[in-house]
Each structure stands twice: as C-alpha cells, then as structure tokens.
UniProtKB/Swiss-Prot annotation:
Keyword annotations: Membrane, Signal, Transmembrane, Transmembrane helix
Transmembrane regions listed in the UniProt entry: 35-55, 63-83, 89-109, 114-134
Compartments, record wording: Membrane
Membrane topology, as annotated: Multi-pass membrane protein
Signal sequence residues: 1-32
Protein name (database record): Transmembrane protein 276
CC terms in the record's Gene Ontology section: membrane
Annotated source species: Bos taurus
Length: 193
C-alpha cells in the first residue's frame, strides 16, 4: 500500500494525543486509583518512546507498546472492577496480563498481535459490562471506544476507506477511550464518597 501524504504528521499527532491524554489521566488519578494511574502512565511512556525514536519500528519501542497493552490496560480494568467489588475479575484480568507479558518473548509477532488485540477487547467488554450495570456513561463510552480500536486493528487496511492510516485511527480511539475511562473513574470515586 502506498504511503498517504501527511502520514508522518498524522502518526505524530495521534501519538501526542494519546500520550497527553494518558499522562493527564495518570497524574489526576494517582491519588485515588493507583492501579489505573500506573496503567495510564505505562501508555504515556510507550507513546513517548515511540515519539523519541522517530516513530520507527524499533524492537524496544514495540516491546514497550506490547507491555503497555498487556499490563497497562488490565491495570485500568483492575481498578474499575475492584472499586465495584468484583475482585475476582480484577485479579483474573491483571494476572492474565502479567502472564502474557512474561510469555511475550515466546510468542511470534502474529501471536503477540492477536494476544494484544484480545487483551484490548476483553478489557473493553468487561469495563463496558460493569459500566452498564453501574450506569456509568463515561465507562460505557470508554468501552465502546476501546472496543472500536480493538476491532479496527483486526481489519485489513486495504479493505477500509479511511482518510488516515488505520494505526492512527486506533490511537485516536484509544485516546478517546482513555479520556472516557479517566472520567469514569472520577465519576465512580464521586459516587462512593
């Protein structure tokens, strides 16, 4: 597929947006939700390393993105479930993410891709379910946005009629989902106080 004009700018902007949203969410949730703050911080650090390396496909940058996905997103879900009293699901999600992070070296590139997309979808669906039952509209939007990013990443780009590269759209959706999760955690905290 031929590169789109302005593709590098699009990629840089999507990385900046995701990094800024994740860093803001990490800083503002650090007092009340340390697990979620760590997940947001992992996502911000992964995007920062991608930007610092010039948006390349360096192995270390890809490994950072892998860890941010399989540990960072389950950390977000962990806090979301834990606050609502679903400790077993919280522990299961986080434990599964830790096992995947350790097993990442034993998976091929395709295996890591599929496992990462599965983590995104599982986190999105479980938070969406909790958000529906607790009527947390921000959590619902976050689940939908993260689920859309996970589903879009599975589609073949040449079949899509997109103005931007698929990876950039996924990052924009992830940034929107992260912002919504940040607001959902804030809403949850206000409900419990």
């Amino acid at each position: 597929m031929t590169p789109r004009p302005g593709g590098e700018w699009s990629s840089a902007l999507s990385h900046l947006a995701l990094g800024a949203v994740s860093l803001h969410a990490a800083l503002s949730t650090a007092q009340a939700n340390r697990g979620a703050a760590a997940g947001f911080l992992l996502q911000a650090l992964a995007t920062a390393t991608m930007l610092a390396s010039g948006l390349g496909t360096d192995e270390d940058c890809l490994a950072g993105a892998w860890v941010a996905t399989v540990i960072g997103l389950p950390l977000l879900a962990f806090d979301f479930h834990w606050v609502n009293g679903d400790c077993s699901s919280a522990n299961l999600l986080l434990g599964g993410g830790m096992v995947l992070a350790v097993a990442g070296d034993h998976l091929g590139a395709e295996g890591r891709s599929v496992a990462g997309q599965a983590v995104v979808l599982v986190v999105a669906v479980t938070i969406l379910i909790v958000a529906v039952f607790t009527t947390n509209s921000y959590g619902m939007w976050g689940g939908v946005m993260l689920g859309a990013a996970g589903l879009l990443s599975r589609l073949e780009e040449d079949r899509l009629m997109l103005l931007l590269p698929k990876e950039d759209i996924c990052r924009w959706a992830l940034a929107g989902g992260s912002w919504a999760y940040h607001r959902a955690l804030h809403t949850q905290r206000l409900q419990w106080e």
